[in-house]
Amino acid sequence: MNGFAVIPSVTTTTTSGEPIASDVARKQNLLELDREGLERFFEDVLGEKRYRAHQVMKWIHHRYVADFEQMTDVGKALRTRLQACAEVRVPRVVFDKHSADGTHKWLLAMGTDRKNAIETVYIPDKGRGTLCVSSQIGCGLNCTFCSTATQGFNRNLTTAEIIGQVWVAARHLGNVPHQQRRLTNVVMMGMGEPLMNFDNVVRAMSVMRDDLGYGLSNKRVTLSTSGLVPMIDRLSTESDVSLAVSLHAPNDKLREQLVPLNKKYPIVELMASCERYLSVNRKRDSVTFEYTLMKGVNDKQEHAHELAKLMRQFDCAMQVKGAAKVNLIPFNPFPGTCYERSTEVDIRAFQKILLDAQILAMVRRTRGDDIDAACGQLKGQVVDRTRRQAEFRRTIEDRVGRDVAA
């Protein structure tokens, strides 16, 4: 998992794990490596001691230096050798936008052709700053209420492209690990399904939590998944970050309409995998279940009662009150969607039913919607390999045509 290649180095893969062909011999991008991988690179390729790798890792992730010549406590001879066989290649910022509420969004170009781009969002709040990180260019799961799904899918992001989002944001914010923290939390909730890019995501999260990296505690790094049951089980043995599940419906019939993955991994299997995750990771005492509220779709009182029952069953299975936490998310509209946001009255009524059932339920405050940076609005720039963009455009055109005819 911590392997590296100096020449050539092709780390970009499709979902099936096949490399994308490249005729260009590349230097090793050090952002691609976690601590163990960097130590091996310094020992095996450069013939250097491990502490040299630690020096360079701190320059990269603590001081945000990408030029070896600026690493002043690294010997000149080593800097010259690093220039010859390695690089620190970070994503290029296409543009960045500021929201009136302080939210900040970056569009970052990915890959050497720069044809694809992803979005990364920073959300400041009292005493904390959360970075929402993408794991794929587009998404292959086709959830019907998500803007990213309409863009189709291109490929998985490399480890360097994932941790590079953190690097760009932290550098912009003037974040100083262990001292002046502007970036306190990372959520893998951006574009893509993180567990479909398992190895690269886990390696990137390792750097986020490493003291030589960004020094975040395990509980401050959250992975959100639509429910790939086998990969949740694998995650429980390889990482102990906080787990969030995109539930969005309290029963299989409705969830299959919203999250097609449910046809393969129904709710009973999904909940069982969450139970196993907490059983293996004793330091984690809860799973957050995300529930996007859409007007007339999943926001009725019967849905709330059904969800409360499902959450109580999870608490009972774990023998811990509060093992299930619910994050209610008002739907954030995007062009062409057929869904609407639930009314404030219905949102509060839904929450009250959960609270009365002694289920911890919070309503997520909408942030960054004026710059399309709110939950479910990220779309980036995707060279689609799935034809989904064209299908979505045809759907919109058909809908407009029917409206005109009426």
Swiss-Prot record:
PANTHER family: 23S RRNA METHYLTRANSFERASE, RADICAL SAM CORE DOMAIN-CONTAINING PROTEIN. It comes from the Bacteria. This is Dual-specificity RNA methyltransferase RlmN. It catalyses: adenosine(2503) in 23S rRNA + 2 reduced [2Fe-2S]-[ferredoxin] + 2 S-adenosyl-L-methionine = 2-methyladenosine(2503) in 23S rRNA + 5'-deoxyadenosine + L-methionine + 2 oxidized [2Fe-2S]-[ferredoxin] + S-adenosyl-L-homocysteine; adenosine(37) in tRNA + 2 reduced [2Fe-2S]-[ferredoxin] + 2 S-adenosyl-L-methionine = 2-methyladenosine(37) in tRNA + 5'-deoxyadenosine + L-methionine + 2 oxidized [2Fe-2S]-[ferredoxin] + S-adenosyl-L-homocysteine. Its EC number is 2.1.1.192. The active site is at 119 (proton acceptor), 375 (s-methylcysteine intermediate). InterPro entries: Aldolase_TIM, Methyltransferase_A, RlmN_N, RNA_MTrfase_RlmN, rRNA_lsu_MTrfase_RlmN/Cfr, rSAM. CDD domains: Radical_SAM (cd01335). GO terms for cellular component: cytoplasm. Reaction proceeds by a ping-pong mechanism involving intermediate methylation of a conserved cysteine residue. Keywords: 4Fe-4S, Cytoplasm, Disulfide bond, Iron, Iron-sulfur, Metal-binding, Methyltransferase, rRNA processing, S-adenosyl-L-methionine, Transferase, tRNA processing. Binds 1 [4Fe-4S] cluster. The cluster is coordinated with 3 cysteines and an exchangeable S-adenosyl-L-methionine. Residues 125-370 form the Radical SAM core domain. It is found in: Cytoplasm. It comes from Xylella fastidiosa (strain Temecula1 / ATCC 700964). GO terms for biological process: rRNA base methylation; tRNA methylation. Belongs to the radical SAM superfamily. RlmN family. Disulfide bonds join 132-375.
